[in-house]
From Swiss-Prot:
The lineage of its organism: Bacteria, Pseudomonadati, Pseudomonadota, Betaproteobacteria, Neisseriales. GO terms for cellular component: plasma membrane. It comes from the Bacteria. This is Na(+)-translocating NADH-quinone reductase subunit B. The chain crosses the membrane at residues 56-76, 119-139, 159-179, 266-286, 293-313, 318-338, 347-367, 377-397. It comes from Neisseria meningitidis serogroup A / serotype 4A (strain DSM 15465 / Z2491).
Amino acid sequence: MGLKHFLEKIEPHFLPGGKHEKWYALYEAAATIFYTSGAVTRKAAHVRDALDSKRMMILVWLALFPAMFYGMYNVGAQAFGALTPDLLQQSIANDWHYALANALGINMSSEAGVLGKMLFGAIYFLPIYATVFIVGGFWEVLFATVRKHEINEGFFVTSILFALIVPPTLPLWQAALGISFGVVVAKEVFGGTGKNFMNPALAGRAFLFFAYPANLSGDAVWTAVDGYSGATALAQWAAHGADGLKNAITGQTITWMDAFIGKLPGSIGEVSTLALLIGGAFIVFARIASWRIIAGVMIGMIAMSSLFNFIGSDTNAMFAMPWYWHLVVGGFAIGMLFMATDPVSASFTNVGKWWYGALIGVMCVLIRVVNPAYPEGMMLAILFANLFAPIFDYFVAQANIKRRKARSNG
C-alpha cells in the first residue's frame, strides 16, 4: 500500500462527522507535506501557479540553511577561540552543553575542525530550534483546532527565523516564552497567517528584548562560554569607532571581509552576510521575496548613512560608519532579505514596497546612530515600518483612483 493510498483511506475519519474530526488540522498538515492539497478555488480570484503557499514557505525555510549551518559553525569557532583549559573544565562541570559535547568526544579547542565546531554549535542551536518549533507548533495546532481550519505553513519560517535571531546562550524557557508571544499575540490574536500586521518572529524577539534585556543584549551573551564577554562589532564601533573593531580573542583588527564572511560574535543566523545573500538571492530568483523592498531598504540605508557621514560628529563614532559597514554588521542583512520581505506584514503595492523598504533603511541607521542605549536598529525599524505598510498602500491606491478619475473625466 502506497503512502498516498494510505492517506486517502484514512482521510474520511478526519473529515466532518468522522471519529477523528477534531484532529483534521494535524492530518491535513501531515498529508500536504508529501502531496499537494486537492482543494480548489471556489470563487474569484482564480490563480494558477505550481507553487502553493506550503511549498513557498518550505523554500524560504531551505533558503535559511546556509545561514543556519554557518551560524552553528561560528558558535563553535567563537567559543573554542575563547576557551582556556580552566574555563573548559569549569564549563564541562556547570554547563550541560559542554558536558554533552565532552561526552560525544568533540575536541573543544581552537585546533578543532569545521565539523567539530559545527557539532558544538548544533548543541546550542538545535535545542533552541526544537523548543521554538514544539511550543510554537502547539499554539498553531491549538488555534487551528479551535477555529477548525488547516495549520498554516508560515510557522516553518517563523520558527527558524526566531531561532536564528537570538543569541546562542538564550535560556530555553525564554525561547518558549518569546515564540509564544510572537505566535499568539502578534499573529493568532489578529486571525492567524495572512492577517497579522507585524512579523511574528521579530515581535517575539522584541518582547524578550524589553522583558529580559540582559539575555538579548550586552557583551556576555554572544559567545557560548560562561563568564566570557565579547562585544558585537556594532557595540565596538559605537564605543571606539572604526579603530575599536578588534577580535576580542586574538586582538587583531576585524576587517570588512571578516564581517562579510561572519568571523565575529552575534546572533546565531545573522553573522554571515555572505550566507544570507546566498539564501536571499534564491528567494528573489524564485520570486518569493520582493526585490523592490530589498532595493528600497538599501537605498534608504545608503542615503541615511551618507547623510550622517556628511554631518559628522566629534562625540558619536556611529556618525562615521559608512553604508558598506552597516550592511555587514548586526541584523541588517537577515532583516532586509528575510523579514522586511515578509509578504503579509509588508506593503502590497509596488510603489508602497519602495517606500516601505526605504523607511526600514532610514529607521535602521537612525536608530543605530542616534540611540545611545542600544547600537542595533533593524528589529525596531522593521516593526515600525510594519505599522506604516497599510498606510503606504492606502495612499498609493488613492493616488491611482484619482489618476483614473482624472483620465476618465479628461
